[in-house]
Amino acid sequence: MNWKRLALCAMLGITVLSTTACSTKTGEQPQGNTVKAETVAMPNFTNAPIADEYAIFDTNYGQFKVRLLGSKAPITVKNFDYLVKKGFYNGVTFHRVIEGFMIQGGDPDGTGAGGPGYTIPDEFSNDLHFNKMGVLAMANRGPNTGGSQFFITLGPTDWLDNKHTIFGTVVQ
């Protein structure tokens, strides 16, 4: 692992720690949308693969760049892109951090219970694993319940394989 990636992850941890409480539980699962008063239909995202692209995350402590894996998780990447273009994530914080495990964001309510009002299906790939720091994945509350919340791993978390859709990786 190069020092830039380590520094980025440390910066992310500090960013999150400055606005959230820490938990030290191990073996946890990132939590997804649990309650939404209004339910809306999922936009019509096809599962046709798309080209990988990049997203820049702006935080109070700087930027980081993520490669979005449209070739492996096209519905999830299209959903993320759709929400970004709608401004859904503007002003949203990383609301949950577990040291050595992950940071979680994407909840407009900041409580861990918010989401877009619809869910998307899981997309698993035999080529993608939670074997390193910097994996970007969709948080959920069970099979096929992803929405807007996502998390970035702070280390290997292999127990999450085939439980959360991996749709990107931190590259800078």
Describe every region a protein language model picked out.
Residues 2-172:
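Cyclophilin-like peptidyl-prolyl cis-trans isomerases
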